[in-house]
Amino acid sequence: MVYLLDLSGVYCYPVEPLLLRLLAEASGEPLFYLSQAFYDLLPRLKAEGPGVLEALFPGASRLYPKAFRPRAYPFPEPFHLVADLPPPEGYQAFFHPEKVEALALALGALGLAPEEALYLDDNPLLVAKARALGFRAEVFRP
């Protein structure tokens, strides 16, 4: 069994907009141009956790304390962030306008059938939507 998590579900907080804002402030670039930089950061974020952000952006943990809370439980293994999969599928999933529909791209990137993976999200509405689209999905709580 492979577990798929979306980025905000990993930290149980809307992390993506906060990270993009930090990147914009640090680089002076408009948000629109930061998508590739954020995508490039994902493997480190997955491997090292949110602490990597403090190293890159001193003061981030003070500005966004909820994104840096220690997890009460470990993640199930093996897990993949939906946006952290091999290009082009992972790249497309990151930019997909409908996050749940990006699960098909994630499964394609991993070469998995829907029954071989479980999507975990902290948002019950997205879990219900994923199930309605034929994916195995459960609510994940820290």
Each model region followed by its residue ranges:
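Short alpha-helical
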Residues: 18, 101, 124-125
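Short beta-strand segments
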Residues: 13, 80-84, 121
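N-terminal helical cap/lid subdomain that shapes the substrate entry/recognition surface
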Residues: 2-71
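Substrate-recognition "cap/lid" segment bordering the active-site pocket of phosphatases
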Residues: 82-116
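Acidic, Mg2+-coordinating phosphoryl-transfer loop and its flanking beta/alpha structural elements
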Residues: 114-142
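Substrate-recognition element of Asp-dependent hydrolases with the DxDx(T/V) motif
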Residues: 54-58, 62-96
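Short glycine/serine/threonine/alanine-rich loop segments
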Residues: 29, 77, 112, 135
